[in-house]
Amino acid sequence: MTDEHLLHGSCHCGAVRLTLPSAPEKATKCNCSLCRRLCGLWAYYEFGTVRIEGHPENTAEYIWGDKTLRNVRCKTCGCVTHWEPLAPEPGGKHGVNLNNFDPRLQESVQVRRFDGADTWTFID
C-alpha cells in the first residue's frame, strides 16, 4: 500500500483523527458481545505508534469486563475509533477500528474472524 492518504482516518465528524504508522497486513473481526455491536474491524499496533489527535479531549471511554482496556469513542458523533490498554506495558498493543478509514485500506487487508463469544480462537 503506497497511497499515504489511506493511512489517515477519522471519526464521522472529524473530531478524532488517526494516522497509522503503516498499512496493516491483517485485521480481526470479533464476535464478542461488544465487538459485534460496535462493528469493529481491528488492526493492531504497538501502543503509542498510532498518532491520535483529539484524544482525550474529544473522546469518551467505556471500560468493562476484566477492566484491562478502554474502548474509545468520539464524544460528538459516537464512532468507536480504537481501544487501548489501561496499563500499557512495553511492546503492548492497542486496536484501531479500520472502519474509520478509506474502504480501500480494508480491501488490502486479510480479515481474520475471531470467536470472542465462545472459544477465544480464530475460526477461519
Each model region followed by its residue ranges:
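A short Gly-Trp-Pro
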Residues: 1-10, 15-124
